[in-house]
């Protein structure tokens, strides 16, 4: 799994090579220090070497220490650069992949999980890479070199550590074996907590309006407790590593002291050599400990890597078909056709149809309205036109060509859309409007704002078009937000303009002005509007009435008043509501 991610370190390969190279040199330098110290004790202090030998060996130790320090710092810097580069590349490629996801893909992963994968999971992989680029080279070099020196110095005494190492490795393997599933569960609980927090922050106004803070606290406590329990389950296994390793280390040191003291007493080993032996034993045991730490980090990193690779290798449900490349496309006129369309949200094909047997033609330049009760599939219907979802059965055609045969960018460039949830981004009013068309002139910007009845309130803002909007446009009203979104869509001069309940927050007079602007300025544009108020759609060229999953009726307002019980019921209920409110 980690091998799959290693290709994403491109651009930072030199640092990824430098880090282990320099850490290997550092380990070799540290290998000679105990030997020099043993010489100082045995030859300089207890022997005939005197101060001359001590100075010579001391300068050698100083030179090796400086070289070791330089190599260690270089390795640390290189590993940091390489790991940060890997993290940057992973985040960039994941974010780019997410931009290609369809709505169904987003629903499948969930936005909270994608955020966790893009941040927490990548950070874990990044930290593990930084540590392992150093430890996984240092540990084997140090372990093997120190063991070889120990064998040369005293093979019998080395047996103490040779017996302990397999026991340590077995215990480490048993602990690590049970950790991967626990870390995977831990990451999933982070997803759950993030989802709870995200929902709360997005809906904080609703929470306060309905006095649901205590309910939200209880929901957060549940997610938080589940994360704590998952974390504890993983940590309880992990904390076994330290006492197990320390026990093995102290047992080894006691064994070396016991047997080594006997060797010194019998003259088979010099005091300085015993000191050096102790140093090498510590190096060997610390190497095994480093391997344990790396394995622990790798266990969690593998769990995170699986989640990251799952995103990177996901094939978007909706993508350009091979046939769409280089295809001659029809002239952009704005004709929309639904032919025998069935649709269900379940990717497996199970579940009930949200839309069934939809046959509908919208001619170029027509003003078509879609009405119906809540949950009848109105938004789903229009979401099929820009191919946010693919039909389960049948065809959706734009200008006579199946939407699946268009390059996605070309299809969506023909469509301007104001979604049911009005989204504005942090930045200026101008920057938000230019999402519609980045190369629009100032005059076009002003005209689009006027057409959407947004110009007056924009100019009343402190900096006009250069007034900054907070994230999500929270510093403008719901009606102002809707009008800015309409202006953004109109600035695009689309062949097809789709408005999904986009005037629900504006008053009737303003809505009438927007409708008049459509008739004057969008004569050649096909307008499809979803609305709850009959007053918003009664002048449409065609009104489509959805009921459950199918088209119950279609026609003009006058025709439907004569032929459709559902439409007549909607109209009469709104008239009665208007009288009651009056």
Per-segment meaning from a language model:
Residues 1-13, 114:
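A short amphipathic helical element positioned immediately N-terminal to and/or at the very start
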Residues 13-74, 78, 151-156, 267-271:
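Transmembrane helix-loop-helix hairpins at lipid-water interfaces of multipass membrane proteins
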Residues 98, 220, 308, 338-340:
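Conserved catalytic Walker-motif region of ABC-type ATPase nucleotide-binding domains
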């Amino acid at each position: 799994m980690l091998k799959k991610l290693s290709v994403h370190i491109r651009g930072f390969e030199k640092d990824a090579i430098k880090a282990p190279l320099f850490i290997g040199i550092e380990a070799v330098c540290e290998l000679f220090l105990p030997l020099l110290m043993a010489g100082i004790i045995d030859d300089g202090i207890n022997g005939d070497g005197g101060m001359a030998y001590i100075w010579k060996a001391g300068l050698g130790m100083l030179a090796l220490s400086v070289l070791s320090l330089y190599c260690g710092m270089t390795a640390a810097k290189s590993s940091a650069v390489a790991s940060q580069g890997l993290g940057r590349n992973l985040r960039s490629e994941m974010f780019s992949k997410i931009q290609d996801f369809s709505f169904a893909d987003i629903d499948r992963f969930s936005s909270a999980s994608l955020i966790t994968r893009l941040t927490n999971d990548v950070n874990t992989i990044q930290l593990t890479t930084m540590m392992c680029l150093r430890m996984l080279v240092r540990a084997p070099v140090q372990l093997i070199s120190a063991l070889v020196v120990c064998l040369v110095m005293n093979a019998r005494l080395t047996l103490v550590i040779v017996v302990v190492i397999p026991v340590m490795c077995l215990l480490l393997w048993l602990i690590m074996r049970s950790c991967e599933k626990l870390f995977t569960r831990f990451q999933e609980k982070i997803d759950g907590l993030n989802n709870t927090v995200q929902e709360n922050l997005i809906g904080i106004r609703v929470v306060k309006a309905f006095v649901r803070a205590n309910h939200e606290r209880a929901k957060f406590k549940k997610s938080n407790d589940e994360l704590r329990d998952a974390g504890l389950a993983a940590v309880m296994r992990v904390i076994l590593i330290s006492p197990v390793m320390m026990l093995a280390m102290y047992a080894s040191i006691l064994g070396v002291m016991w047997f080594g003291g006997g060797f010194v007493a019998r003259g088979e080993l010099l005091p300085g050599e015993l000191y050096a032996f102790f140093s090498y034993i510590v190096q060997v045991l610390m190497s095994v400990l480093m391997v344990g730490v790396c394995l622990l980090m790798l266990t969690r990193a593998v769990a995170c890597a699986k989640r990251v690779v799952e995103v990177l290798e996901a094939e978007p449900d909706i993508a350009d078909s091979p046939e769409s490349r280089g295809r001659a496309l029809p002239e952009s006129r704005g004709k929309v056709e639904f032919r025998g369309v069935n649709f269900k949200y379940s990717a497996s094909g199970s579940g009930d149809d949200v839309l069934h047997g939809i046959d509908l033609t919208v001619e170029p330049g027509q003003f078509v309205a879609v009405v119906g009760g809540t949950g009848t599939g109105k938004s789903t219907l229009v979401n099929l036109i820009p191919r946010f979802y693919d039909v389960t059965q049948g065809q959706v055609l734009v200008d006579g060509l199946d939407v699946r045969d268009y390059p996605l960018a070309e299809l969506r460039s023909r469509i301007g859309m104001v979604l049911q949830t009005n989204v504005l981004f942090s930045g200026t009013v101008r920057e938000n409007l230019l999402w519609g068309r980045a190369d629009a002139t100032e005059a076009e910007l002003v005209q689009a704002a006027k057409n959407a009845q947004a110009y007056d309130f924009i100019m009343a803002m402190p900096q006009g078009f250069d007034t900054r909007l907070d994230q999500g446009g929270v510093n403008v009203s719901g009606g102002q937000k809707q009008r800015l979104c309409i202006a953004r869509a109109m600035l695009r001069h689309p062949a097809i303009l789709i408005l999904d309940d986009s005037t629900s927050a504006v008053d009737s007079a303003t809505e009438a002005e927007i409708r008049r602007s459509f008739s004057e300025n969008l004569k050649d544009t096909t307008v499809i509007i979803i609305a709850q108020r009959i007053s918003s759609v009664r002048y449409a060229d065609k009104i489509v009435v959805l009921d459950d999953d199918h088209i119950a009726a279609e026609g003009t307002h006058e025709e439907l008043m004569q032929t459709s019980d559902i439409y007549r019921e909607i109209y009469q209920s709104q008239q009665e509501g208007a009288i009651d409110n009056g």
